Amino acid sequence: MKITRIAVGVLLLTGLVLGIRGMRADSKAPAVGTPAPEFTLNSQEAKPVSLHDYKGKWVVLYFYPKDFTSGCTVEAHNFQRDLAQYEQKGAVILGVSVQDEDSHQKFCTKEGLNFKLLADTKTEVSTLYDSVMNFGVAKLSARHTFVIDPNGVVRKVFLDVKPQPHSEEVLAALTELQAAAGK
């Protein structure tokens, strides 16, 4: 009986993982060269932040599943580690997940994060960017990243993100994009 439950659990988990991977393959995320969907969400300070607030700057818009989880913490730490390099390139980092402002504030305080985390509690922005993992009653933001140019156009999309090397990958892409744009 216990073996049957374990086998069923493994099969369900396998189906979930394959289903998420399948979503990525058929992604309807904003494509490179298209305008980034506009949004307004509250930050960890409970203040509204809109994409258009950053017109004229490069934006690294990264979606992540959940505050205080291992992969999300590693990813956030690495963005924080590299924050000065992003700022030198005229870029801002905006993190988005489904947790509320209070959770984001606690996460930023505990982990020493000095960039904005946005509360997408209704998954509206995650949906706009095709970055939602749906688990029936629960939804989380999928680990996707969009690099948006100063004119609000998507220039790079990362759909299969690994937390550890991700900030370095984004920095390399940003450097390449800026060189191509003559910056």
Q: What is the predicted role of each segment?
A:
Residues H52-T73:
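Short active-site neighborhood of thiol/selenol oxidoreductases, capturing the structured segment around
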Residues P30, F39-V59:
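A short beta-strand-turn-helix
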Residues G71-L113, T121-T127:
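Structural microenvironment flanking redox-active thiols in thiol-disulfide oxidoreductases
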Residues M1-N42, K183:
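N-terminal targeting signals for export/organelle localization
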Residues L113-F115, V132-F135, K139-F146:
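Structural micro-motif
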Residues A36-P37, W58, A142-H144:
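Short loop/turn microsegments at loop-to-beta-strand junctions
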Residues L140-K183:
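Thiol-/selenol-based redox modules, centered on thioredoxin-like
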